[in-house]
Amino acid sequence: MNDAKLKVRACVFDAYGTLFDFASAATGCRDVLGDKTGALTALWRDKQLQYTWLRGLQGRHADFWQVTADALDFTMESLGVVDAGLRTRLLDLYRTLRCFSEVPEVLKELKQSGFVTAILSNGAPGMLADAVSGAGLGALLDHVLSVEQVGVFK
């Protein structure tokens, strides 16, 4: 087989859990959550993914922001955390999740090596724009692609 056909030209990443630390929202509320921080993070993420799978199977798409809020509501109720202000704070923090510490340098090295860099995510376009901007990654990404254009979670 011709080596030119095998040449990698682009590196495409998932956003949440790969570039952005979804745990950073709950960690940012540790002052209120205390020892429930880890449990909230784990259950919120599990429900978020489960809701995307269920919606896909049922053909009932909703954007990832709605799924994220629904998963948080379930999680807070399950953990007995009833606090509208905390809910708002968690969702605000989720829109601007921290990226993992190595991400900027890795993306920079990939760009300098000539690779096209991109995100392909379940995230809604606005969520992704906020996360990329908040983490200062805009200049390091060539494309930010959301499943919203096709209306089906990956």
Task: Specify the residue positions occupied by each region the protein language model found.
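Hydrophobic packing residues within well-ordered alpha-helices of enzyme cores
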Residues: A26-R30, V103, L128-V132
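Substrate-recognition "cap/lid" segment bordering the active-site pocket of phosphatases
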Residues: A118-L120, A124-K154
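Active-site neighborhood of HAD-like aspartate-dependent phosphohydrolases
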Residues: M1-L49
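An amphipathic alpha-helix signature
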Residues: A26, T41, R45, W65, ...
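Short, acidic loop-to-helix structural element flanking the phosphoryl-transfer center
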Residues: H61, W65-Q66, D83-I119, P125, ...
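A metal-dependent, Asp-based hydrolase signature
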Residues: V32, G38, T52-R89
